[in-house]
Amino acid sequence: LCVYIPQANAQKVKDQEFRRVVVTLTSGEKVEGYVKRGWHAEASAFKKSNYSFKMTATPDDKEVLKYTADEVVCIDYTEKTENNPDGIRWESRELASPSIADRYRTIRRLVCLENTGEHASVYWWKDWDVTTNQQGMKRRLVTYHGIRFHDEGKEGEIVYIPMLVNSVLLKDKKPGLKEFSKNWFKGKEGKARKKEADADGDGTWMLDMYEAYLAQQAK
């Protein structure tokens, strides 16, 4: 059976391949389709950032499926590029989000896997930072990087931004990590590390820092 696809339509479908994904649900089921644009934080001014998304079976399908971070394990983009030879992956993880009432509060969000090592993985995501001053409320889009430790057992889904790694939040779980992390960019070697981290522009430095911390703990 041969189906004729007009060249213009074929090109249109091809142009949408960057949206093609395989979504793994918490049930283990895999759903293939095309994720709708505008689900990232940039377009989430009035809803939870990086929490829900919509997809369709084909680029032009009218039937829309909606999923949340509570329903999925990960979103794997099928398109491979030079910068992402394995494809882009968004994972559903718990973000450490302490509050005055609960130091250990977490919120489940979708975060993009940036790099993974033997003992930890690092992620990035964007969210809105809201500040209030005499002029009123100011919103700005901020890119965050965070680290997830592989040895936390059932709690291994938690992703911590550097500021929280440097806090008392991990005092009991990772003795000495707070001080080790704070000193990572200090001194002559630290300045060289900071320069390299700034040039990279990602969170990979956290993997190096954590490996060095583990090596020190093993002595």
Predicted regions and their residues:
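Conserved glycine-centered beta-strand/turn positions repeated across beta-sheet architectures
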Residues: 21, 31-35
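Short strand-coil-strand connectors
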Residues: 26-27, 61
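Eukaryotic, compositionally biased intrinsically disordered regions
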Residues: 11, 29-30
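C-terminal partner/receptor-binding element of secreted or periplasmic proteins
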Residues: 184-219
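Aromatic-patch recognition
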Residues: 34-187
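Intrinsically disordered, low-complexity regulatory segments
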Residues: 15-16, 31, 216-219
